[in-house]
């Protein structure tokens, strides 16, 4: 299969639409020998800020000397943009190769009586396969929609991140903040730490789920924070309370919400650093500056 053939196949899957659920992706990754279990992952959901937090974390991990993959959606120009390693999009050749292997698994799944996987499910499986083949140290995985029934939720990550929760996709996720928060909180796994900037009733849903799962919870405004020092259209300077003391952090994105996103990424990196000594305060700050 060449790249053009791969693209024709991927685009042909668009007609199957969006169908939330775990049965298809579970069957697909099983046929691919569970590539998602061969990589360490960070799972990110939330109404806004997923992309920013994913970018910050990816740069931090790369700056820490880790081979770091990132899976995001949607793309701007090419599907290749959805899966990258250390900031480099998957090549056309590798894209075609993982498409061919994943298509073979889809064909087997269908022959065995399975339901046709959606485009997003197939691309998600492709990303897991590519990252496993490349033996990445970490993969930052962004949820497509919601969380609980999203195809990315087959992973058991090192860390779960829920940026925030507001009304979105009410036709699929629910018509209240609480209902949508339940979908977002669906990524929380047993004993896996959670970092969030959610507040109000959404936070309470996340807090209850975290307690039920015995998952340590870190909340913006309670367990960590950020204080703006100076800002312009080009960059912002704020104070962040590391364990060793407050440090000045510069980001190159405007808007108060970006400071919150940056703080979430910083806390996420600190949590990961508890198990990975290569992720130091110096490397974290370097990664933030490179974002």
What feature does the model see in each segment?
Residues 43, 75, 169-170, 257:
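Histidine-centered active-site/metal-ligand motif
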Residues 68, 233, 253-266, 291:
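Short glycine/threonine-rich catalytic loop with a Thr-x-Gly-x-Asp
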Residues 57, 61, 127-131, 262-272:
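Buried hydrophobic packing segments
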Residues 20, 52, 120-123, 183, ...:
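A generic structural signal for residues located within well-ordered alpha-helices
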Residues 110-111, 115, 135-142, 157-248, ...:
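Acidic, Mg2+-coordinating active-site environments of NTP-dependent enzymes
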Residues 22, 26-30, 34-37, 63-155, ...:
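ATP-dependent carboxylate-amine ligase catalytic core
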Residues 1-48, 52-67, 76-78, 104, ...:
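N-terminal leader/targeting and accessory segments in enzymes
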């Amino acid at each position: 299969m060449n790249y053009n053939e791969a693209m024709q196949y991927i685009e042909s899957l668009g007609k199957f639409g969006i169908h939330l659920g775990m049965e298809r992706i579970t069957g697909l990754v099983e046929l691919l020998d569970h590539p998602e279990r061969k990589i360490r992952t960070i799972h990110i959901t939330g109404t806004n800020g997923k992309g920013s937090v994913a970018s910050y974390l990816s740069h931090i991990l790369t700056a820490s000397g880790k081979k770091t993959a990132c899976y995001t959606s949607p793309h701007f120009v090419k599907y290749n943009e959805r899966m990258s390693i250390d900031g480099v999009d998957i090549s056309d050749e590798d894209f075609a190769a993982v498409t061919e292997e994943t298509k073979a698994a889809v064909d087997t799944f269908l022959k065995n009586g399975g339901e046709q996987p959606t485009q997003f499910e197939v691309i998600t499986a492709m990303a897991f396969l590519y990252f496993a083949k490349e033996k990445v140290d970490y993969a930052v995985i962004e949820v497509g929609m919601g969380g609980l029934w999203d195809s990315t939720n087959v992973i058991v990550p090192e860390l779960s991140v829920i940026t925030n929760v507001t009304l979105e996709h009410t036709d699929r996720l629910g018509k209240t903040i609480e209902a949508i928060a339940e979908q977002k909180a669906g990524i929380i796994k047993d004993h896996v730490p959670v970092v969030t900037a959610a507040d109000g009733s959404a936070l309470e849903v996340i807090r209850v789920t975290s307690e039920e799962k015995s998952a340590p919870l870190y909340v913006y405004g309670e367990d960590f924070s950020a204080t703006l020092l100076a800002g312009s259209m080009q960059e912002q300077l704020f104070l962040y309370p590391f364990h060793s003391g407050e440090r000045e952090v510069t980001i190159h994105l405007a808007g108060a919400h970006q400071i919150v996103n940056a703080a979430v990424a910083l806390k996420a990196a600190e949590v990961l650093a508890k198990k990975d000594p290569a992720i130091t305060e110096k490397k974290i700050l370097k990664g933030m500056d490179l974002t």
